From Swiss-Prot:
One of its GO terms (cellular component) is mitochondrion. Zn(2+) 2 binds at C61, C64, C97, C100. GO terms for biological process: endomembrane system organization; phosphatidylinositol metabolic process; pollen development; stomatal closure; vacuole organization. This is 1-phosphatidylinositol-3-phosphate 5-kinase FAB1B. GO terms for molecular function: 1-phosphatidylinositol-3-phosphate 5-kinase activity; ATP binding; zinc ion binding. Component of the PI(3,5)P2 regulatory complex at least composed of ATG18, SAC/FIG4, FAB1 and VAC14. Residues 279-293, 838-850, 1151-1164 have a biased composition (Basic and acidic residues). The PI(3,5)P2 regulatory complex regulates both the synthesis and turnover of phosphatidylinositol 3,5-bisphosphate (PtdIns(3,5)P2). Catalyzes the phosphorylation of phosphatidylinositol 3-phosphate on the fifth hydroxyl of the myo-inositol ring, to form phosphatidylinositol 3,5-bisphosphate. Plays an important role in maintenance of endomembrane homeostasis including endocytosis, vacuole formation, and vacuolar acidification processes. Required for development of viable pollen. Might mediate recycling of auxin transporters.
Amino acid sequence: MGTRDSNNRTFSEIVGLIKSWLPWRSEPATVSRDFWMPDQSCRVCYECDCQFTLINRRHHCRHCGRVFCGKCTANSIPFAPSDLRTPREDWERIRVCNYCFRQWEQGDGGPHVSNITELSTSPSETSLLSSKTSTTANSSSFALGSMPGLIGLNQRVHHGSDVSLHGVSSMETSVTKQGKETSRRSSFIATDVEDPSRFALNSIRSDDEYDEYGAYQTDIETSHSPRANEYYGPMEYNGMGIDDVPCKHLGGETADQKSLSGSPLIHQCLESLIREGSEQFQKKSEHDGRDECEASSPADISDDQVVEPVDFENNGLLWVPPEPENEEDERESALFDEEDNEGDASGEWGYLRPSTSFGSGEYRGEDRTTEEHKKAMKNVVDGHFRALLAQLLQVENISVSDEEGKESWLEIITSLSWEAANLLKPDMSKSGGMDPGGYVKVKCLASGFRHDSMVVKGVVCKKNVVNRRMSTKIEKARLLILGGGLEYQRVSNQLSSFDTLLQQEKDHLKMAVAKIHAERPNILLVEKSVSRFAQEYLLAKDISLVLNIKRPLLDRIARCTGAQIIPSVDHLSSQKLGYCENFRVDRYPEEHGSTGQVGKKVVKTLMYFEHCPKPLGFTILLRGANEDELKKVKHVVQYGVFAAYHLALETSFLADEGASPELPLNSPITVALPDKSTSIERSISTVPGFTVSTYEKSPTMLSCAEPQRANSVPVSELLSTTTNLSIQKDIPPIPYGSGWQAREINPSFVFSRHNISLNLPDRVIESRNSDLSGRSVPVDTPADKSNPIVVADETTNNSLHLSGQGFVRKSSQIGTSIMVENQDNGSELTIAQQQNNEKPKETQSQKEEFPPSPSDHQSILVSLSSRSVWKGTVCERSHLFRIKYYGSFDKPLGRFLRDHLFDQSYRCRSCEMPSEAHVHCYTHRQGSLTISVKKLQDYLLPGEKEGKIWMWHRCLRCPRLNGFPPATLRVVMSDAAWGLSFGKFLELSFSNHAAASRVACCGHSLHRDCLRFYGFGNMVACFRYATIDVHSVYLPPSILSFNYENQDWIQRETDEVIERAELLFSEVLNAISQIAEKGFRRRIGELEEVLQKEKAEFEENMQKILHREVNEGQPLVDILELYRIHRQLLFQSYMWDHRLINASTLHKLENSDDTKREENEKPPLAKSQTLPEMNAGTNSLLTGSEVNLNPDGDSTGDTGSLNNVQKEADTNSDLYQEKDDGGEVSPSKTLPDTSYPLENKVDVRRTQSDGQIVMKNLSATLDAAWIGERQTSVEIPTNNKVSLPPSTMSNSSTFPPISEGLMPIDLPEQQNEFKVAYPVSPALPSKNYENSEDSVSWLSVPFLNFYRSINKNFLLSSQKLDTFGEHSPIYISSFREAELQGGPRLLLPVGLNDIVVPVYDDEPTSMIAYALMSPEYQRQTSAEGESLVSYPSELNIPRPVDDTIFDPSRSNGSVDESILSISSSRSTSLLDPLSYTKALHARVSYGEDGTLGKVKYTVTCYYAKRFEALRGICLPSELEYIRSLSRCKKWGAQGGKSNVFFAKTLDDRFIIKQVTKTELESFIKFAPAYFKYLSESISTKSPTCLAKILGIYQVATKQLKSGKETKMDVLIMENLLFGRTVKRLYDLKGSSRARYNPDSSGSNKVLLDQNLIEAMPTSPIFVGNKAKRLLERAVWNDTAFLALGDVMDYSLLVGVDEEKNELVLGIIDFLRQYTWDKHLESWVKFTGILGGPKNEAPTVISPKQYKRRFRKAMTTYFLMVPDQWSPPNVVANNSKSDQPEETSQAGTQAE
């Protein structure tokens, strides 16, 4: 009995061994006893080394066959029986060792996981996904392996009786997975396999592989291996084979110039087609199913057509899919249909099937496609591709033309690239790679001829077999790939004990080789080393061995051959073997040595794995040149394959979308040069093509049925022209601005006709110093000689556009896009001005700050945000991430739609809502792509099980049908479109070029004017594009500009002056009439004559003021001139009143003798009493006919009866001397301040000189005051003079004179106690002349002489002018009434250069302006600085802190002192904080005794000299500052809580804000650091957004009668919003505590932080990349400075200027330091003792904390729109950033 059992057992073991060798049988998980380690050679446990005894028995692991003790084999795992229908609970469990048990638990590397057939959603790998293909393999040398250890998986395997390599069996796998995951879902469908060799050959990858879109699993994952000849079959473009691409482009084959670029070209002024409006979403009952989607209001169409709004919220029918274009697509196709596949040789993908070929409508059916269009389309694609390769060859310095005896590289590369691209079908499963560069490798072989170059359908590597006796040529080879090494180690680096190694090494290696041989491989590929014993065993078994293969190469071989990399021999199964039709090893002597190499020829050994079953790897072998040339060609080939591959995918996608296939389009082709330093002379143009005029398309005349007729020309015309291409050298550029209008060309490859945009990959772009200037590049390619050709340089971004013989270089102007159309044809040239206020001169001086890198053009940087419309919450805040085209983080378009939008099991991690509850928004450049999803309850699209994705669109600009935008017929997305890069899909969507956007069959843009729908089952996704406003950033300019146009306030001042003058002259005329009625006719004629003359003078002067010639930067109407005329009218009123009084008293002298009167009119004048000459250097416009000045300064006007008056003042009696050369006034003698003769209180009587004119009948009061009789006088000898300080009299460039007259001096207040009477001027009649007949002198003295005499004779005492205020008018009273109504105070002495600044009691800036122009202020701020005073004790202001503590670490370097120097000698080095050691302030006091009472004004100017120097840098001139400050108005500023006084200057240039005492003390402390920081920022052009403070003053007024006194400290700050139309205004502190304005209505409402945060989800503020960087740099610099100065609680004021798309911003309120009261406030708010939210940080925190919070908030508030294509043109000094700015944002790249 025992013998029989033993025989039976032996027989069964033999049968089992034979069965294990049969390839058709799945091997069980238990290892055959033949592969168990022998008992006698194993004396200790393999794991714990314990000795085996009678008690401690040996136990073999049923999985690896090694011997262990009982403790080490205590685990068991389930074993799937051969009948996979056996229920799981009936599965047998087998004993395994601890290591195998851990492998089973981990599920990686063991057969339990690796044998699972991975299923793919990719339609490229299964007929389930609408490819309608079923394939069989003729390489059936694989047996279906075992699938042991599958838990939860049901598998059924039917074994056929045919055990041959071509046997047939079937397998049906049904894989299900229960449960639903929160953010990922995996479901599988059933599949049938009719061939045992058609198992999944793709390698298994972890489902947990990271994906930047989130952890999603595919819905359907299957893969099948078709026949090799089917994989390598020709691809067809709607029946147009690509395999027959000719090697030479015949002359009759033309290429269309219409570029269907996917690359974003520079935006034109095309506006939004669908602007996202207010979106209301309500979450309804889950069982209702009528979920509302988002509302969209399409507006702002680029033409005049009005688009009706589309109501997404209420129009559920908008989402209903239209009818299918092809009824056959509606049918649910069988899973495998052999007949359907027989005619489709396009392979696994079913690329470009006839049903989904070019175009829409009639072009999708074979019977509706003409051969002419197919041929023309093929010519377009091939022509542009050849042009691209020709350009790349030129970059590599490789000749494009045929050389003697050699074939052109252009033809060879074109053929190889197309062949490789057509064969390539990447693994589109979730774990597969998309990059075609990872599947096609290029090898260089310096032997043979160029035409020997070929595409190997497999892998070629530089390897050889270990032993020469091993086979090097095997047909139908079976490969086994082993990871690690084949040595006596369990796994790599796991060592065993020495004695165990000695005992078991040979036995183990023999068993391992036996296991390998049992699988019958022909070739063994090992990653690392192999033991010598094993090598001998393998040689004996006739197995070729290859060692030390790098892991990437192993992966490629495994991917192509279908093998799996086995970690150890314990996991062997026949299912893991690979296969290739031909394996061989060849040796090639390299005949063409490298340049400079001599001697022995190198022999290169190459190993071939040819005709692999899967099209997942190819090798292009380049031959026929030396190594150096082949390396250059290699770069071109690598890119050529990438370009050809993407060309096919993008073309198919556009065809599916319904892009119009019209050929005659007028867009130039753009070709980008790689990263090279090229100039205009070295630029090349090799792009073939032609231009056919485009007829105007009328949307109402075109229909979907006839998309071709409006724009087509016969194809025969398209194929009629040819040209040769050559490099253009030394072509003179057309100057910009000479009528040329151009358009910027984007540096991207634009594939003609079908929107293929390809950019150089990183591996291709390498800087090479190749001289392209002298090469001729004839290319036998059709093109019209008048074709506009563009060569764009990626590095410089200078687009060069060649049109015939014309040549234009891209303008450097920011925001101006340039395109020069065909010059020969006279095409219209257009300019799209994208930004209104760009300044070319400022841009040209700026260096490119962020140069683009080549990698930028191989990826797209987008911003993504997601929000739940059901809950109204933001699920995913806007963030940046980069998608590299076809890279590891890219996805096929089909998978993105399936995983992200159509996965009904998806639940958002944030809101737990499904995908249809969300709206996703991608932003890039100037547009946003909004994705909405809707679940249809009553409609189901067919083909869900097959994975069909349907496409259609609705045009928003076509006439409505039943109230809805018309829809196109829906089509099934082709397999090639399914595999399109999602990144390229986004690039297509955001591109704003006419070629890229493509026109639909109705003539409108697909991506701009249409809603694009994608449907799958009952899920529909809608993609819609809308333009967004990308704002640039405008920082406070370093030099303030003044707007001199359209200033209403100056017009009002002008009208007031004219009105006063008219009132004066009319009042005088009326008074003259009254005098005439009383009988005083004697003087009436003379009075009327003088009145007419003075009125004519006034009108002439006003005309000169209003119509003067002005230079750039000067006001059209000088307000200071108006002030002077206003003051002159006041004195003219006084003079006319005296004239009329005098005339009314002459009735007693009616009969006087005329001769006597005439003698009295011409009295002799003493030399000491001569009339001073009028200022010769005046440029006053008020000089009329009475007083005219020649350029030499001599008075040539008529002086009336005073014609004997000397024209030069006597130097012994006058106060001043004038220069002989005219104009400049200088003191006659320089005396120190202590030598003033006024110091001696000596009575000085006015003595009447001989011949002095005596005035009669004047008012006694006025006359007494006039000559000083009522005052204590001192007599000034005629030989004494009053000398002025030289610094006062020097001509300061800070104050350009209006009238360079005599500069009066306002003596300090303490010196005004001396009452001095001066000799009366000859122009002023004296009362001492008693002869009444001489009173006619009032008429004979011209008014201007009288006015100037007043200014000259009362320089030293403003009290003399007060006498005018004491005069009571009799005839002329209008001026007195104006004063009583609160008018300006004009009786104050004039300022420097006779400048008149009126003072208004309710306008503090007028007081400041007057003080700044006073001689006293100039004396105190003179260069010597003796009179500068310090008021620390009086003002209770602490001394400034040491400037050394304020030295923020900034990278801008030290201050350039030459930049800070002021032109004036007084202003030199005033900004240097170290030049003064104490706070220097100037105080000016002045007063007026007017009608309203005596008032004293005191103005204290803090840091007067430093502020003056700062203004010298930041302002065009000091006079502009004075003009602006002369008038102001109270301003109700909003947003602040301090309730302090606010005012604005009437020109809106400056803002006046009251400063509290604490703020003033804080500023005084850190003012030196402020001046230093601001000066450094300006000199180094470092970005800063501090709103410049140009002065801080204390203004005090005191009414002497009432004793009322007011004081106010104010600062003068630039108005950041000057000249702006701001719709929204934000005051941002970075805090959320009490930072919300509930009343946001109104145009001037200031919004706060919470208002901005609330608006961000729906209406965010977008800025460009460069603008964001500029903003951050400025904020970083300023906050660092403010924190060092212990300043906090500042704000960023942001105004949104929608007209210019700019953010006008600046930091304000930075005067407050962190003092003890702020400490206390912070503590109270933090603890919440007095109420308020406790969970929010207080607004008042320490400066360092405030800085960090402020920076973070400002970075978050403004969303950056990435745009990697725009040239960097941030201009720091005028704070302009480019309009969509791009992007290589440092630190924001999310990959």
